[in-house]
Amino acid sequence: MTEFVGTGQFVQLSAHSLEQLSKGVLGAINCNDAIATFVARHLVQANLMGIDSHGVVRLPQYVEQVEADYFSPAGTPVVTRCDRGATVINGGRGFGMPAMQLAVETGIAQAKANGVAALGVTNCGHTGRLGAFCETGARNHCLTVILGGGARRDWRQVAPFGGSKGMLPTNPYSFGIPGGERGSVILDFATSVGAAGWIYAAKSAGASLPEDMIIDRNGHPSQDPQDYIDGGALLPAGGAKGYGLALLAEIVGEAMLGRVTTDMNWIMIVIDLERFQGVNQFSASAEAILAEMRECPPADGFSAVEIPGEREKATAKQRQRDGIPIPQQSWEQITAVAARLGVPVTT
């Protein structure tokens, strides 16, 4: 999902100007320069790829969470345990993006040494776009899997299949694997019909939601983002299938990794593909599989069969050239936060 229904005016901005503004806002809430730079770049990259729900629209939310002491912008991740391929990383109550970056870098090194690595990531704030970390694994010829859960006490966002109120978080999954000549194949999805971030982004943009995405607090279907905010719930993706995936992630997040202290807990699995097939043989086989998919005649209403991750790459090229569209209402909220923090805004 990359568009909202009924969105109004947009402001077109360069990636550089958005990154500088984001870095300024993050610095103003006590991020050190390295963390501010990394998180700002991560957010803008999400916007470039068309994943606007995980882009700069998150800045007001992050500021609000820091001011409420939900997480610490100065927190830094550390490896607290490493035992025979099983590693635990404590995010230090900081932003989740640096914790995930430490996890994937550690996981790649361990997978290259041992074939496989499993890493738990705990005690950190929002982790951003999970696909970014799976891309890092894929570039290093690894299969990377990430899933998160355990936060249902704080985030009862998704109704279980057959239920009428929110009981589970959106418990996202991401997978990344090399894909041949055109780059990696990346899957990154919430176990709900859409990510909760899309709802807040839609509200910020003054937009309505697609049908069959949320229910209101009484269990009735709705397209109004406010109905979700006022106690409604997202629906599980694919009905029982999305519910089952979410429930599994919830058990992993808490029963396996311990009670959540900040946001949610994560498990990352990294596998060195060279332990199974050489790089050239793998790439040729993957390319042949993807070529078969692309040759499939498109159904009515579609121009072509796409490979997961390719649309985002194309969007990034276009937005790098033409600028990133930010809904006017979202931009006003971001600039209001920046002004309150004394951060200059340039476009």
Spans of model-derived segments:
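Catalytic-core signal marking the mid-to-C-terminal active-site face
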Residues: 2-21, 256, 260-347
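Acidic, glycine/proline-rich low-complexity segments that act as flexible tails and inter-domain linkers
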Residues: 2-14, 20-39, 44-45, 52-70, ...
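Active-site cofactor/substrate anionic-group-binding motifs, chiefly glycine-
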Residues: 54-108
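Solvent-exposed alpha-helices and their adjacent loops that cap or buttress functional pockets
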Residues: 79-82, 111-113, 138, 165-169, ...
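A generic, well-ordered mixed alpha/beta core segment in the N-terminal half of proteins
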Residues: 86-180
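Phosphate/diphosphate-binding glycine-rich loops and adjacent basic-rich segments that engage nucleotide
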Residues: 153-223
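Small-residue-enriched flexible segments
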Residues: 195-253, 257
